[in-house]
Amino acid sequence: MNDPNGLCFWNGFWHLFYQGYPPEDPRQHWGHAISKNLIHWEDLPYAIYPNPEGRCFSGSTFVEEDRVIAMYHGTDAGNIVAVSTDPLLLNWEKLTGKAVIPIPVQDGSPQEYTVFDPCIWSKGGKYYSLSGGTLLTKPGGLRRAADFLFRSNDLIHWEYLHPFTEGDIFTLVGDDGACPYFWPIGDKYILLFYSHMSGGQYLLGDYDKVRDKFSVFSGGLFNFGASTPSGVHAPSSTPDGLGGVVTIFNMNPGMDTKGWNQIMTLPRLLTLEND
């Protein structure tokens, strides 16, 4: 068991998906568990199987009135959208049967964006998605965390807009922006993500909905020490409906484990206090 994915509330249950695989197919699938209280969980059959992608990596969900949308990274393909309408989210249909945001062709030229772990939301009748990754810094060729913004009318055809965050002085050179989740919190917005170098992190700021930019004014770590082996890693989060954000991380059980055999944390409720 590895990253938690797609935490959401649907039809009276909390749903948590996660990277896992059955004994007969050692490729990442999306496992699935449900809970009434975020503490006691019941495991369900695997929700999403890898095809045509090599493996189902991390992603998020977006709940609409009549369906739940999942968007995740499929290795060797790109970012994939699947939808479900049934009461327990047991059955998922992948739109188009292929990646809706394919991995760019590597031809040696500079890349505008990277395609990796996505999150998804809607605004003004359109869908928006972040793709986690890095930006090349100059001089020196070092990389910094970045998340790249895409927009779509129909979940199938996506256009690339630009790097999403501005004013980030809180992440370090060498961080990346994997497993992003972007949600309102209080009267601000929070971007949660995972750096393979520094562990779970967040950025806090204002969402300029005209320019589609995230102006950052604060940030921090979810670990107060080393991120491995016992720190928290990838987040999965969803709004609580009251202005807060519920988040679950994965973590090693206090020691190094083989094959990313990890555990999930207790849920954290993130809220924004007045200055």
List each model region and its residues:
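Repeated scaffold domains used in trafficking and secretory/extracellular systems
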Residues: F57-G59, A178-P180, V232-P235
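Structural secondary-structure packing elements that flank or coincide with functional cores
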Residues: T238-L242
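Beta-rich carbohydrate-recognition and catalytic domains
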Residues: M1-D117, W121-V173, P184-P229, I248-D275
